């Protein structure tokens, strides 16, 4: 089936729906408002974490999708989780970000497995409205980069205080941090209205952060030395919810795939021409409440995997066909409403873990070409 959306000159103007993949779905847990996913290396094995947006569990799974244990039962409000580099299971997580209207008490915590088989949870830093964060390494240093969706909230749907991006060098030893002694953060960019999207992208051997907001998409590059500052590049100025850099057409230069605007219904791919990102493709159908995003290889092909939480609530993959010079779309699931996805390879098979928030299920999709 081929659809012909309205396009302008020099853009890819054909979307082809295909069925090239063999997909097996397995529901591995039921978790109300399941949201965040993160890989975790623990006791020498590859695992992953899934946590809830509201007050509910954080669950540790093995790579087969079997539940290992519960890390916590509350307070929830988990938007992001990231393993501490080199640690045996220790990770950072957001707590108490329940929604844009209920995130004043949000913080970043340290979760550490203890010798008695339990988990210690301590405060790293109180940061109201913190939504996304990550750990980025460069030249032997590890940096925490944290994004607040907004900077204040007085009434429902209050967007009068734009979000900010914070950063700090993360010490190797986190044992001293708690509610009384917290990590000191520095604002590296403010004015980030609806500061929602985050994706780590490796470019020229350097870990970088692609951050999306109402004022556009930015790439944050960590300091090269102790005497230098973060480098910040604006990639586009279009209101955006999430974005990732990926070389989808395999021409050696990364394109920019964008979900727009904030929690919006549009998917665009931009191609860099003469140093400027120009629109290359617009998905012909509205994709209501776009949210989940993965950019990377899927079954050996550069792919953008997208999930949305309203309308058809689908999970689908976009790829580029060089012979036909078109974008191909393959549906993975419908009626699921993913909030986030995580991809890995096991036994030469591609695995996608999705937190299908709208139906309260954690799903494992095993995908083969």
Predicted regions and their residues:
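Short, Lys/Arg-enriched N-terminal segments with co-localized hydrophobic residues
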Residues: 3-20
């Amino acid at each position: 089936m081929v659809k012909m959306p309205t396009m302008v000159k020099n853009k890819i103007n054909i979307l082809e729906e295909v069925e090239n993949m063999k997909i097996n779905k397995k529901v591995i847990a039921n978790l109300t408002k399941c949201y965040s996913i993160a890989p975790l290396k623990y006791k020498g094995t590859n695992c992953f974490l899934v946590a809830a947006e509201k007050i509910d569990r954080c669950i540790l799974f093995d790579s087969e999708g079997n539940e290992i244990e519960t890390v916590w039962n509350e307070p929830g409000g988990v938007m992001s989780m990231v393993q501490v580099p080199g640690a045996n299971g220790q990770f950072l997580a957001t707590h108490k970000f329940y929604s844009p209207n209920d995130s004043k008490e949000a913080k970043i915590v340290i979760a550490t497995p203890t010798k008695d088989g339990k988990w210690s949870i301590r405060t790293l830093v109180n940061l109201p409205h913190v939504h996304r964060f990550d750990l980025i390494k460069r030249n032997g240093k590890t940096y925490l980069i944290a994004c607040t969706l907004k900077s204040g909230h007085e009434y429902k749907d209050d967007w009068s205080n734009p979000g900010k991006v914070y950063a700090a060098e993360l010490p190797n030893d986190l044992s001293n941090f708690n509610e009384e002694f917290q990590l000191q953060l520095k604002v590296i960019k403010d004015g980030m209205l609806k500061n929602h999207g985050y994706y780590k992208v490796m470019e020229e051997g350097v870990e970088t952060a692609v951050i999306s907001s109402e004022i556009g998409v930015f790439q944050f590059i960590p300091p090269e030395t102790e005497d230098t500052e973060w480098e910040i590049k604006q990639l586009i100025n279009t209101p955006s919810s999430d974005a990732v850099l990926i070389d989808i057409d395999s021409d050696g230069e990364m394109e920019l795939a964008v979900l727009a605007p904030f929690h919006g219904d549009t998917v665009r791919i931009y191609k860099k021409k003469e140093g400027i990102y120009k629109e290359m493709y617009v998905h012909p159908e509205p994709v209501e409440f776009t949210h989940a995003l993965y950019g990377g290889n899927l079954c050996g092909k550069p792919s953008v995997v997208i999930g949305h939480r309203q309308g058809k609530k689908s999970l689908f993959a976009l790829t580029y066909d060089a012979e036909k010079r078109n974008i191909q779309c393959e549906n993975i699931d419908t009626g699921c409403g993913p909030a986030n996805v995580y991809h890995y390879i096991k036994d030469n098979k591609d695995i996608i873990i999705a937190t299908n928030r709208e139906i309260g299920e954690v799903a494992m999709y095993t995908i083969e070409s």
